[in-house]
Amino acid sequence: HYDVLTKRPTFGQRLNPSDYYFLESRASTARLDNPNLQPERTVDYEVGFQQALTNSMALKIAAFYKEQRNMVTATRVFDSYPIEYVSVDNLDFSTVKGMTVSYDLRSTNNLAVRASYTLQFAEGTGSNSTSQLNLARSGQPNLRAPIRLSFDQRHALLANIDYRYKGGESYNGPIIGNKRILEKPGVNLQLRAGSGDPYNPQSNFNSRALFTVSPASLQKGSVNGASLPWKFRFDATLDRDFVWQRNEDSREIGINVYFQIFNLLNARNWNAVYRATGNPDDDGYLNSAIGQVFVDEQNSPNSFVEYYTLKLWNPNNWELPRRIRLGVRVNF
């Protein structure tokens, strides 16, 4: 597999002449678009090998490499007249490489299995077009060094197990009173597991629930130097197919009745954490020295602590809990 994709940037390419007319009155941290951006380029390679183990079983190994160049990112224009300013340019690059091992068992004795494991390394100078924006606004040099990207999920495991009885002459289930009691039902179980996404650890404690963040966050270690915990999720589906026909001349209508459970084990997987503590429900501010002083200054410290803690419980920091669906699909 070989693929080359070239596309126009979707960020920062609009020209607004008024921004330049009043450049001197704008703050030096203001961002100006760049109408002279070049197309972003992605080159994707993949090579694989597939081997049949039996008539119904196969193993596939694939290695992939993706390179992105001329990616748009924020940069600071130094020594410009009349003031220095922040703009965007085609400076970022990234590489994503890894391998995938897949196992496929076609339906054998009512059982079908598909599973895959992916090992991936994603590095580059920026995860998106604004990842360098704060650095450019701070007046620091335009540093470029490969780091872990924010979507660098090192390990990913997927598995799909399906067990179902077929209909007609292929039925091999129990029969009671000439009745095929388990004709066309099925049970499907899906597993999704993977290592956590990287994030930037923080060395000091500040408030993430107040309207103003004080003091400023201080980076701890390297960019994206910490990772979220592993995620595990099971989804289960129980369904059965039916065929309905009004009369011999009418068209058959397929009906599928299903009972579906997402996040079967009600796992509390983390989507995001507070950088200072690495926890999804505590930013560490209330227990810090500066936080305790701030709490003591409130009219009702106990009420403040209670409401502050409630605000820290951001539901977006967790994946959705267990959900149950009962439905009908009609195919005609």
Where do the model's predicted regions map?
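C-terminal beta-signal and adjacent terminal beta-strands/loops
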Residues: 6, 168-215, 229-233, 239-332
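Gram-negative outer-membrane beta-barrel transporters
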Residues: 63-68, 79, 84-196
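Membrane-embedded beta-barrel scaffold of Gram-negative outer-membrane proteins
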Residues: 3-12, 20-24, 29, 35-86, ...
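Extracytoplasmic loops and strand-loop junctions of Gram-negative outer membrane beta-barrel proteins
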Residues: 26-33, 81-88, 96-97, 139-145, ...
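Outer-membrane beta-barrel translocator domains and adjoining extracellular loop/strand segments
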Residues: 10-17, 24-25, 72-78, 120, ...
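Transmembrane beta-barrel strands of outer-membrane/channel proteins
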Residues: 1-4, 13, 59-65, 115-119, ...
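Membrane-embedded beta-strands of outer-membrane beta-barrel proteins
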Residues: 35, 47, 89, 99-101, ...
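Residues that define the transmembrane beta-barrel architecture of outer-membrane proteins
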Residues: 41-43, 93-97, 153-157, 230-234, ...
